[in-house]
C-alpha cells in the first residue's frame, strides 16, 4: 500500500504548477488584490511602520496594538514637531480614526501583540503605502505580473501614478512617510505551462487583457483624481482574475470559453429568462473550476505513479498530517473506489479520484477556489445578490464595475455602433449582453441549454 495522500499538499502543488497563486476565499478583499498588484507593478515595497502606528487605532477585537497607544503617538508627533501647539490628544485620536477608515487598514487581522511589517493592506495610492507580501495578496501579485508582461504601457502608467504620491491621502500622511524601498521582482505566471506554450484560449485572453488595458489607460489619463484611477484599475484587475479562474479549464483541458452574461433585466430569476441564464453562466464557471481542479489532482496522481491498483488499495486521504480521516472522507473515498473499478484505463481512474479529492477538500476547507471567485465578485460588485443567504449568483454589475467595463471598451471621444460594442465586450472580457444571433450562438456553444430568445437578449441590451 502506497503513502497516504495528503490533500492539502496536493492542493498546494496544483496551485503552484498550474494556477500561479492560491485562490483561497475565506477573508480575501479587494484591498488584498490592490496591494499585491501595486507591489508587483511598482517592483518594490516600503517600510510602513510609522503609517501603521499612526493609522492602526485598533484591531478587529477593539484592542490597541502595542506601540500604537494614543499617548505614544502624541508624544512622538510632538517630539518630531509634526503637530502644532494647541492640538489636543482628543483631536489627534479623532484624526487617527479617520485615517484608519481612509486606508481601510485591515481590521480582520489581529495585531495586538506587536506591529509587524506585514498582515496589513492599504487602499492608499502611492509608493509609500506598498507593503511586503502577506496572506491573500498572491492573487494581486499574479494579475499584476500578467499586466506588467502583456500590457506594459498600463503597468508603467500605474507605476508613475504611485511614484507621484500627490493624492490627498499621501499628503495627509506626509509627516510620517518613510522612503526605504525594497525590491520586488516576482512574476508568478512565467513558469506556468499555460503561458509557456499558450493555446488559442490563452492567446485570446491575453489579447483581450492587452486591448482592454490600453483602452482603460487612455480613459484614466483623462481623469483628474489619482485615487479614483487606482480604484478603477483595481476593479479591472479583479474582473480579470475572475475571468482567469473561469478559463483555467479552457487553458489546460481545451474546453469551451465560459461567457459572462450580464443581467440588466432588473428582475428575479423566477421572472426573467435573462436573469436565469446569467445565474446559469455563473454556475457553469463554478463547475468549470471544479473540473479543472479534478484534472489537476489527476495529473499529480499520474506524476506520482498512482495506478488503478494502487489507488484501489490506498488509504483514505487526510487533509493534513495533524488530522485523521473523518467518516465523511472514508465514505467519499469508498464511493470513488466503487466508481473506479468500472474504469478501463489508469487515466480514467485518476480522474475519478481527482474529482473525489476536490470534493474532500471542499468539505474540509472553507477556503476553496470557488469561494475566492464568489467573495471577490460580490465584494467588488460584479455578482448579485451580495449576501451569503443566496449561493446562486448572477452577473449584475455595480456602477463602479460597469464604469470600468465601459472605460475599458470605449476610448475617449470614440463612438461605437451596437454591433461594435457587442464585439468588443466579448473579445476583451468574454461578456455577453444580448441583441444578436451571434451572442445567442456563443451562449449555446458554451453548452448552456437555455429557454432564452433573441428578443429577451435584445431587451437586455437596450437596458444596458
Question: For the regions a protein language model found, what residue spans apply to each?
Answer:
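Long, internal scaffold/assembly segments composed of regular secondary structure
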Residues: 207-335
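Positively charged, polyanion-binding regions of nucleic-acid-associated proteins
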Residues: 396-414
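Long, mid-chain structured domain cores
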Residues: 80-254
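Short acidic, hydrophobic short linear motifs in intrinsically disordered regions
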Residues: 412-428, 432
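Charged low-complexity interaction tracts in eukaryotic proteins
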Residues: 374-400, 441-464
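Charged, amphipathic alpha-helical stretches
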Residues: 1-109
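Long, low-complexity, charged/polar intrinsically disordered regions in eukaryotic proteins
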Residues: 313-396
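Short amphipathic alpha-helical interaction segments
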Residues: 430-445
